[in-house]
Amino acid sequence: MTEVTELMRPEGEALNTKEVLLNLGPQHPSTHGVLRLVLQLDGEYVERVDPHIGYLHRGTEKLAESFTYTQIFPLTDRLDYLCPPSNNLAFALAVEKLLGIEAPIRAQYIRVMMAELARISGHLLITGALPMDLGAMTALLYAMREREMIMDLLEMITGARMHTSYCRVGGVREDLPDGFLPKIREFCEIFPNRIRDYERLIENNRVFLSRTQGVGVISATDAIDLGLSGPNLRASGVDWDIRRDEPYEIYDRLDFDVITREEGDCYSRWLCRVDEMRESIRLIEQCMEQMPEGPFQVDIPTIAFPVDKERVHCSMEALIQHFDLSAYGFDVPAGEVYSVIEAPKGELGFYIISDGSPKPFRMKVRAPSFVNLQALFGVTNARYLADMIAVLGSLDPVMAEVDK
């Protein structure tokens, strides 16, 4: 049999091979959005990958120039639509820097608690979606069960499950409703055991491990050179987290560990997100313990809407305040600012130029998914076509944030 096989194998120029271009997407379930990858293949090896983006471009940055600062919050919801509270927070902090104000302490605790709920929500999806992409369906069903609990909590606070628009310049839209804290405590008690369930599903799954361990390796040096951030950076051994290293809001009052891994492969990126969910639970519990009573937005009539909505119906001053802020907005001092937070996907930044009017002269969004997607150039060379799904899934891009 060996002799026959050797005789059948072509030699030299008799082996006729050629490079093939293959389109992956833009309609493909494993791209998790409208992303088109043009792959240059040599057999089953990926020699080159060219991401083609823009299928979900809505002109968010240009639209913002025609909106007042308050009206921009719904636009930020639609960047990383899996984690709207984080987007709201990053934008609010940028505008507050221009105004030279800070939200009340209670509002800061509420914002951080919402941001960590959003982090868990975003990580839950990729925790289940990456195994599903590689054939392990059960993890996604479990993850969606817990994510539904978070959606219920967000709906209880904001009235919306996805596009929450909860932050406001100078605070949050409204205070926590009655009965919310017991609900979130119940979630914090249940969820750590559920995380362990996900790990048990995966840690002995030989197919998932073989498809992710040692696949799509990004070294620490390459991760820094590519500008990666968030779990994709920390999974390569770079110990950097804006919440700790450049703290904003009340993160400097909270105790948490920055999760890092050394391997830099797809499995490490998955594990980083799983472990970060545990830390988010710790942060939420500390927020509930430390949160003081007090106002949930600044008491500046030219910036904040009336706290007591009933006054709008019986007070001329409150009605004028509400109408003026709704129709005209508020003037922001001329200047420019850049504000960045640690969003679930990485460093989310807003660069705003103000000309002194109620609308930004220019707004630029530093979207972490856009930057992280560049890592495809560095990790797919000489890899199998089948590995592309694992690599892309482990980077966890959201195309609405990429295309803006």
From Swiss-Prot:
GO molecular function, one example? Answer: NADH:ubiquinone reductase (non-electrogenic) activity
UniProt keyword annotation of Cell inner membrane present: yes
The record describes its membrane topology as: Peripheral membrane protein
Q: Name one GO cellular component term.
A: plasma membrane
Task: Give the main EC class.
Answer: translocase
Predominant location category: membrane
Please give the positions of the paired cysteines in each disulfide bond. none
Determine if DNA-binding is one of this entry's keywords: no
This protein's UniProt keywords: Cell inner membrane, Cell membrane, Membrane, NAD, Plasmid, Quinone, Translocase, Transport, Ubiquinone
What does this chain do?
NDH-1 shuttles electrons from NADH, via FMN and iron-sulfur (Fe-S) centers, to quinones in the respiratory chain. The immediate electron acceptor for the enzyme in this species is believed to be ubiquinone. Couples the redox reaction to proton translocation (for every two electrons transferred, four hydrogen ions are translocated across the cytoplasmic membrane), and thus conserves the redox energy in a proton gradient.
Q: Which PANTHER family match?
A: NADH DEHYDROGENASE [UBIQUINONE] IRON-SULFUR PROTEIN 2, MITOCHONDRIAL, NADH-UBIQUINONE OXIDOREDUCTASE 49 KDA SUBUNIT
Q: What is this protein called?
A: NADH-quinone oxidoreductase subunit D 2
Instruction: Please name the gene that encodes this protein.
Output: nuoD2
